[in-house]
Amino acid sequence: MPPAVLYIDDSEDNLRLVARILGRYRTDTELLVAPTGQDGLRTAIESRPGLILLDNRLPDATGAEVLQQLASTDVTAQIPVVIISGDSGQSTVDQLLGGGAAGFLAKPFTVPEFIATLDRFL
């Protein structure tokens, strides 16, 4: 079974970009998408992906709030979560990494940076 990546982001442009990158460079990786934190949590519980990519600003929650919910849910607590955000200030990065994020990828990112992130966690 191919590894699955769950991308929690409400931006259709970002979702399309990640889908195109995976379609070209990681055809063995299944992409699951969720536009809200609650949808993402539900999808993570049901699908148990190998990696979760999480936007820091969602319509219903912050990345930190979703990260906390994922960490406190037994079936998702061990899934690595990488925050993807345009807010890459050091205090934000430190807060999210301290809150349990396995990594942080600043927007805009390059294709090699994105692929390296996948390779690190899948």
Predicted regions and their residues:
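Acidic, metal-coordinating helix/loop segments flanking the phosphotransfer/catalytic sites
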Residues: V33-L51
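Acidic catalytic/metal-coordinating carboxylates
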Residues: T36-D39, T62-Q68
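Alpha4 helix (beta4-alpha4-beta5 surface) of REC/receiver domains from two-component response regulators
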Residues: E65, S88-G103, A116
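The feature encodes the CheY-like receiver
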Residues: P59, A77, G89
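C-terminal output helix
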Residues: F109-L118
